[in-house]
Amino acid sequence: HYFFLADVTIPEQMEGHTVRAVLNTGATDIWNTDNPQIMAYVNGRFAATLDMNHQFIILSEHAKAGETYELAFYAYSSAYAGTFTGTNFFRLELAVYREEAAGLYYDMQAVYEAADLLPEDNLSRIEGFKALERCVNLLDLRRPGSAECFESMKMAAQELEGTYYADRRPNPVTVHSIGHTHIDVAWKWPLRQTRQKAVRSFETVLNLMDRYPEYRFMSSQPQLYEFVKEDAPGVFARIRERIKEGRWEAEGAMWLEPDCNISSGESLIRHIIYGR
């Protein structure tokens, strides 16, 4: 368990932009239980949860130069004496978020990942990579961060939209993406960390719902809700509001994910009865 404090001040060049505090711990393996799990506070307020998949805090959508933020971090790692490799670190940086860059990145990533899964002679694969090539050829990366660079990103995004995405929108297929987090109640960390992980994960979901009104989420295992109700009643109250809005689905069908090798038949039946 570690605590970190940092006071950060918005520099003049970030005036008016969306500014994030970006954290890097060196963690890259999602299954590595040494990966730090972090609760982040901004000016004394519980603001975000961080891990290897969530690595930034939004400080301001319209930053003001000279404005100072007090950041506090409570970090946990399951590493213990004799096994910790010393590869984890704690580095904090301020960064400007630019929609031109982020939007283009994800639009290109979607095309690349879809095309890469198809056979080499597949027409959709060929069209996808050709669209990406046209897109990349429009980018002016001679001076990263310059006005010309961001303008070229807009042009590339328009090219990808007009010559690739627009042609595929008439497809009658509709896909609904529903968020979910799988939390093992008895995993490779102590139960108290499972309780904190539930709070961290649900706080992340609530923050995403604040940023994206269309976001929907489903989570099962009523025992997790019991933990959050006991440990973070404020978070639990916000979850209830999202459930009322129809944006958060609290699901069963079992009280928690059981171990079917050890549990008796009666135990499994009780899981289902109380879970539903």
Predicted regions and their residues:
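Carbohydrate-active enzymes and regulators
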Residues: 1-276
